[in-house]
């Protein structure tokens, strides 16, 4: 175990860097400017009850929206009315925000931070991810490269958040493509760990090759779970609720996942890393976004807006990130860091492209 509680593999690469399960604490900001061991011990402590509440709350919101919308739609259709169209649009948006929340919880599981018991952590994390078509085990491998090589040649996330500011027109085009479902296939390739090429160097990236054999096999096996869930769920819905139920499943689950969810993922990724003030450490290359309750619900569920803190100490579970932010702020560690409001971030992102 590392000091922060993150599991380390025993295998090392040729340059001595550990591989496999490790998510390194990014403390390049200033040597020695770290939290006391006793404080860090409290912050990295896992709570089963708090994770159960987080998972349950997200699932209950989804269930409530789906049931309420289904009742309105079926009632309106039976009465030959079209008023249900005004209910579908906000329902799709709300479901997409909660699909995003499920992903954030699967992200916690990828970091081994959802539940103290490893088997429970991985089982719940895999199921949450599979429900929206993602592989938690594949993402675990891919995401480790993002943490350990932030804005480096091996960072697989640069294609999504790199290169900003690019001007307003560029991002508007991207978001329109997201909302029309034109980019979903790229998202699912990424979360399944598919080979890709670095957008800057053109060098092929095969994230599942850069890990331990056991984790590589787990990632490949997890794809079968994802396929099983994605094929089995609609079959079960048809058997239980008929083709009307299947139509609602497509409308309230598939449509949000391939449209609005894609835009949410892009916006959050850009808030976290777009148009940074520097690239030398997570203090500048990552960003903490200060938001109110509306944006927290829409874009930053489960404290995911505290992104600098997450990069500095990835072993801290989501429900302790606000306290971690307070501890770092009190010690002056975030005084020169990328901590901005949502509006300030988007003024940077929407700035004209930098001249070469």
Label every PLM stretch briefly.
Residues 118-128, 279-292:
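Membrane-cytosol interface motif
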Residues 94-106, 135-139, 183-187, 253-281:
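Transmembrane alpha-helical segments that form the membrane-embedded catalytic/substrate-channel core
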Residues 1-96, 131-251, 318-356:
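Non-catalytic, topology-defining segments of multipass membrane proteins
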